[in-house]
């Protein structure tokens, strides 16, 4: 059962962990004989919050918080059955979210 392309999207709050996971996936795919397009860095989403430090007085004193979500995308072409099996056996770190789509 061969597919034309597999698209993998990875998300993480830690870019080092994300790059390590991408490297692991790329090495696994190349070892099975398939080719990889990417990793393509996607835009980083930033969420920011401003909170008052004191609830009653000193309105000018505020704290700023930010969370950054880093994203990468991989396209795997010329897929073999060994590629699919090896991708299913990879164990990624807990801080990485992965989304896999198969396209025909």
UniProtKB/Swiss-Prot annotation:
Record has Ribosomal protein as a keyword: yes
A GO term from the CC aspect: ribosome
Protein name: Small ribosomal subunit protein uS10
Gene behind the chain: rpsJ
Free-text function comment from the UniProt entry: Involved in the binding of tRNA to the ribosomes.
Keywords (A to Z) from UniProt: Ribonucleoprotein, Ribosomal protein
Subunit structure: Part of the 30S ribosomal subunit.
HAMAP family xrefs: Ribosomal_uS10
Coiled coil region boundaries: none
Family according to the record: Belongs to the universal ribosomal protein uS10 family.
GO biological process: translation
InterPro entries the UniProt entry points to: Ribosomal_uS10, Ribosomal_uS10_CS, Ribosomal_uS10_dom, Ribosomal_uS10_dom_sf
Gene Ontology terms for molecular function: structural constituent of ribosome; tRNA binding
């Amino acid at each position: 059962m061969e597919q034309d392309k597999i698209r993998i999207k990875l998300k993480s709050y830690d870019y080092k962990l994300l790059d390590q996971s991408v490297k692991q996936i790329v090495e696994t795919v190349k070892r099975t004989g398939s080719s990889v397009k990417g990793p393509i860095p996607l835009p980083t989403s930033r969420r920011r919050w401003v909170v008052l430090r004191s609830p009653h007085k000193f309105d000018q004193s505020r704290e700023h918080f930010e969370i950054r979500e880093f994203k990468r995308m991989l396209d795997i072409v010329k897929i073999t059955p060994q590629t699919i099996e090896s991708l299913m056996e990879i164990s990624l770190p807990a801080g990485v979210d992965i989304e896999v789509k198969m396209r025909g």
